[in-house]
C-alpha cells in the first residue's frame, strides 16, 4: 500500500529524473527504465503515475510551463509601476529566467518542440504555451498601440524571444541572458515608440 502523501513527492522526483535523463541522453533515449533508475524507483511507478512516457513528458513540460508562469507572476507582483513597458519587461525576463535556460530545461524544451509535432497531446500543450505568450504580449502592446499594430508587435516579440532562446540553446556556449534581454528590450521599445508618433 502506498504511503499517504507520497504522490506529489514521487511525481516531482520523476519529473526531475526526466529532466536529468533528457539532459544526459536526449528525449529519444530517455527510456522509462533510465528515468526510473535516475529517480530510484521501479518502472511500474511511472506507469502508475503517468501511464506512459508521453504522460511523463507532458507532466514535465507542464512543470516547466508552470515555473515560467510563476516567474512572470512574481515579477509582476514586485512591479512598482503599471506601464506596458514594465509588464513587457517582466514577460521577457521570465522567459529568460534560470529555470528556463538551465541545460536540462533547454534540452527538454527543444525535444518537446520537436516531439509535439507528432503527438496531439503535446502539440496541444505547445499551442497553449504559444498562445499564452502571444496574448500576454498583445494585451500590453494594446494598451498603447492600435489593435493591428499591437498584434504585429506581439507576434514579432514572441518570435524574437523564441529565436533568441533557440540560438542560445543551440550555441553550445553559456546562455547570455543579459544580451538576449537587451535585444528584446530594444525591439519592445521600438514598438512602444510607435504610440508616440
Swiss-Prot record:
GO MF annotation terms: DNA-binding transcription factor activity; transcription cis-regulatory region binding
Chain ranges of the HTH tetR-type domain: 8-68
Transcription regulation in keyword set: yes
DNA-binding region per UniProt: 31-50
GO biological process: glycine betaine biosynthetic process from choline; negative regulation of DNA-templated transcription
Listed Pfam families: TetR_C_6 (PF13977), TetR_N (PF00440)
Pathway note: Amine and polyamine biosynthesis; betaine biosynthesis via choline pathway [regulation]
Domain of life: Bacteria
Keywords, in A-Z order: DNA-binding, Repressor, Transcription, Transcription regulation
Disulfide bridge positions per record: none
Gene3D superfamilies: Tetracycline Repressor, domain 2 (1.10.357.10)
Function noted in UniProt: Repressor involved in the biosynthesis of the osmoprotectant glycine betaine. It represses transcription of the choline transporter BetT and the genes of BetAB involved in the synthesis of glycine betaine.
Protein name: HTH-type transcriptional regulator BetI
Biological source species: Pseudomonas syringae pv. tomato (strain ATCC BAA-871 / DC3000)
Protein encoded by which gene: betI
